[in-house]
């Protein structure tokens, strides 16, 4: 059995070397005393079988064996269709992946250079090397291609990156404190690049265009909502101004009513005093009438009692004098009350005039403030309209 099989090449699939080859280097490189041992080892290695028979006994785990199976092929993972001798032909999926990879690397050269400086291999260089290795597989030995490909990991299908996931982690961390406008400027893509991407990857171009339209719609909704809120604020402010004016008018009316009420109270007091005076006068007149009746009815006996008549006259005159003094005092009181009323009326008129002046000044000040606010709002609206026209024009141009 061993004699029928041809001996395996000593150096891993290469033709038998000369005595000065690599496999005989043990005899030459070793010391002089150990030449026979080296020849014996080379002879034993040459007699080893390619597929030794399996022994029944303790079996090692597969993880300890470093041999590769014979049926292993990397052509399906790399997208190669056909045999290696027919030449490398890539599938449509790998072409689309390579084109998307090329576009991504054109857009983000800065991130690729930073990763290359750190020591990580870029995606394009790795794929180019694998393409060169698979392309030269038609002329070279398949075992060499397997060994060269085994050194690197497999190339798997790479999904196209979206606009949100195309940024590196470092860029995201650095741009975290920046405004939204800078991020939108980084993410935005020109119309020419969109046209090129539509030719290469129409699905991605449609997705980007739909995202832009949705963002524009959301911005329009926000602006409309802001306009509605501003209008509501303006209406509420106008209502507040009108209510404040009405309140000032009501305060004026209440002040006038309080003044009139005070005047009416003073008039009532004077009327009561006059009523008391008239009552006293009526009583005095009644007494005089009674005295006159007594005098007219007792003329005859008066001649007899002359002394009593003289005493009655003296009493009557004394009563008249007392009544006159009372009337004079009451008239003096009335004059004082009238003067006090006039003074109070003058003071009230002055106070009303001052209050009216103050209210007019306040009303003028409020009107000036309202005019200033309206001017500021008009300026803000003009600025916002100008800012809105610019992106709408840019969208139309796009």
Swiss-Prot record:
Its main location: nucleus. Residues 7-19 have a biased composition (Pro residues). It comes from the Eukaryota. InterPro entries: bZIP (IPR004827), bZIP_RF2 (IPR044759), bZIP_sf (IPR046347). Residues 125-148 have a biased composition (Polar residues). One of its GO terms (molecular function) is transcription cis-regulatory region binding. Residues 1-46, 112-150 are annotated as: Disordered. GO terms for cellular component: cytoplasm; cytosol; nucleus. Residues 203-224 are annotated as: Basic motif. Residues 229-264 are annotated as: Leucine-zipper. Keywords: Activator, DNA-binding, Nucleus, Transcription, Transcription regulation. It is found in: Nucleus. Residues 201-264 form the bZIP domain. Putative transcription factor with an activatory role. Belongs to the bZIP family. This is Probable transcription factor PosF21.
């Amino acid at each position: 059995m061993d004699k029928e099989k041809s001996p395996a090449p000593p150096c891993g699939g290469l033709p038998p070397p000369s005595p000065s080859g690599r496999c005989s280097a043990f005899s030459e490189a070793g010391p002089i005393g150990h030449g026979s041992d080296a020849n014996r080892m080379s002879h034993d290695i040459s007699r080893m079988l390619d597929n030794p028979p399996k022994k029944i006994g303790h079996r090692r785990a597969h993880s300890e064996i470093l041999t590769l199976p014979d049926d292993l092929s990397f052509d399906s993972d790399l997208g190669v269709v056909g045999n290696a001798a027919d030449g490398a032909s890539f599938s449509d999926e790998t072409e689309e992946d390579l084109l998307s990879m090329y576009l991504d690397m054109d857009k983000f050269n800065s991130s690729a250079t930073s990763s290359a400086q750190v020591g990580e291999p870029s995606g394009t260089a790795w794929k180019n090397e694998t393409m060169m290795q698979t392309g030269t597989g038609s002329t070279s030995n398949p075992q060499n291609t397997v060994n060269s490909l085994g050194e690197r990991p497999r190339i798997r299908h790479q999904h196209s990156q979206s606009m949100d996931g195309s940024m590196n982690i470092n860029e995201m961390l650095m741009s975290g404190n920046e405004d939204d406008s800078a991020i939108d400027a980084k993410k935005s893509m020109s119309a020419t690049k969109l046209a090129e991407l539509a030719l290469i990857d129409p699905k991605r171009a449609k997705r980007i265009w739909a995202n832009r339209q949705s963002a524009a719609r959301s911005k329009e909704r926000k602006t409309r909502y802001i306009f509605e809120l501003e209008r509501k604020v303006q209406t509420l402010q106008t209502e507040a101004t009108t209510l404040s004016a009405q309140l000032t008018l009501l305060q004026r009316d209440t002040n006038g009513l309080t003044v009139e009420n005070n005047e009416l109270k003073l008039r009532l007091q004077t009327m009561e005093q006059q009523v008391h005076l008239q009552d006293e006068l009526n009583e005095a007149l009644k007494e005089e009438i009674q005295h006159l009746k007594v005098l007219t009815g007792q003329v005859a006996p008066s001649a007899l009692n002359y002394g009593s008549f003289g005493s009655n006259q003296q009493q009557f005159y004394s009563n008249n004098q007392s009544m006159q003094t009372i009337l004079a005092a009451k008239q003096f009181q009335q004059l004082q009350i009238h003067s006090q009323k006039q003074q109070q009326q003058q003071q009230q008129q002055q106070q009303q005039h001052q209050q009216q002046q103050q209210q007019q000044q306040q009303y003028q000040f409020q009107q000036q403030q309202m005019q200033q606010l309206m001017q500021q709002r008009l300026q803000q609206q003009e600025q916002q309209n100008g800012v809105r026209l610019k992106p709408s024009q840019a969208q139309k141009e796009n």
